[in-house]
């Protein structure tokens, strides 16, 4: 099964920049997006063969997530069941026969780490949410997790040590998540790969210079490592300041057939 995740940085804009070309060519079983920046009814996306699940932020033009799935799930949930966290449309969970698919757009800690205390609470609550799912079935988590875990995951680690996305605190929370029984699928296949990123600032010709960050992930329950077949980052795909990331599993992960 093929999973794709992409922070589209505004879906309406991305649709004008080739979103559907990539969507159709990649032919994913599950296609997850973050930062849709939409409210209900603002786009009519024709995706034959896919079920669409949307989570919108209360604030207009902000955040938002969606999952497009070929197979209808057993159940769908929006958010993580904590009102403080669930106003910004950041999480969707689909339940299938023997796994959960979760897409997430993690809150940014913002300039001068102004939102770091909230981010820390989010990290703890979201990790507990994932662990509770994992106690029932394996989890496939994807999305913009807004952290470059290690120095190898961004171009300029030394100058970004105290910036949002590479603070010691955020990195430690990712370490804690992975230590709770989860795998960073890209590093599972490519533990030493350098210069492969998923986000580039629009400033300073960052993408042209490949001055990027790897902050978009597929994180899976460690006990299904043997079912992972592939991880990829589609750095050549334009349309957003992020590029799509991919994971492929052997079909031991079954989607419910309808």
What are these regions (language model features)?
Residues 51, 125-211, 215:
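Metal-dependent phosphoesterases centered on the DNase I-like endonuclease/exonuclease/phosphatase
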Residues 7, 23-41, 101, 130-151, ...:
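Active-site beta-strand/loop signature of hydrolases that rely on acidic residues for catalysis
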Residues 37, 42-109:
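Structured beta-strand-rich core segments of catalytic domains in phosphoester-bond hydrolases
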Residues 81-82, 107-123, 160-162:
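Surface-exposed cleft-lining segments at the edges of enzyme active sites
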Residues 60-75, 204-226:
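Conserved beta strand-loop-helix elements of the APE1-like EEP
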Residues 1-9, 98-110, 142:
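Active-site-proximal beta-strand elements of phosphoester/diester hydrolases
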Residues 251-258:
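Conserved small/polar residues in nucleotide/adenosyl-binding loops
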Residues 2-11, 22, 40-52:
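Internal alpha/beta domain cores that form substrate/cofactor-binding pockets in large enzymes
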């Amino acid at each position: 099964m093929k999973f794709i995740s992409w922070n589209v940085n505004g879906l309406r804009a991305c649709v004008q920049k080739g979103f559907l070309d990539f969507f159709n060519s990649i032919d994913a079983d599950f296609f997850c997006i973050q930062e849709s920046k939409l409210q209900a009814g603002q786009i009519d996306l024709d995706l034959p063969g896919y079920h669409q699940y949307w989570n919108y932020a209360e604030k207009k033009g902000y955040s938002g997530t969606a999952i497009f799935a070929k197979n209808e799930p057993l159940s769908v949930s929006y958010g993580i069941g904590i009102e403080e966290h669930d106003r910004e449309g950041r999480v969707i969970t689909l339940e299938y026969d023997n796994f959960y698919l979760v897409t997430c757009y993690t809150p940014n800690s913002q300039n001068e780490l102004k939102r770091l205390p909230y981010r820390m609470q989010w990290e703890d609550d979201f990790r507990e949410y994932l662990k509770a799912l994992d106690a029932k079935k394996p989890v496939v988590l994807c999305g913009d997790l807004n952290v470059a875990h290690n120095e190898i995951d961004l171009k300029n680690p030394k100058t970004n040590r105290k910036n949002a996305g590479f603070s010691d605190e955020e990195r430690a929370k990712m370490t804690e998540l992975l230590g709770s029984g989860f795998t960073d699928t890209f590093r599972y296949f490519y533990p030493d790969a350098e210069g492969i990123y998923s986000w580039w600032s629009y400033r300073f010709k960052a993408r042209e210079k490949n001055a990027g960050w790897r902050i978009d992930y597929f994180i899976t329950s460690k006990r299904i490592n043997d079912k992972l077949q592939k991880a990829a980052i589609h750095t050549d795909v334009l349309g957003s300041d992020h590029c799509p990331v991919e994971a492929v599993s052997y079909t031991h992960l079954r989607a419910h057939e309808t």
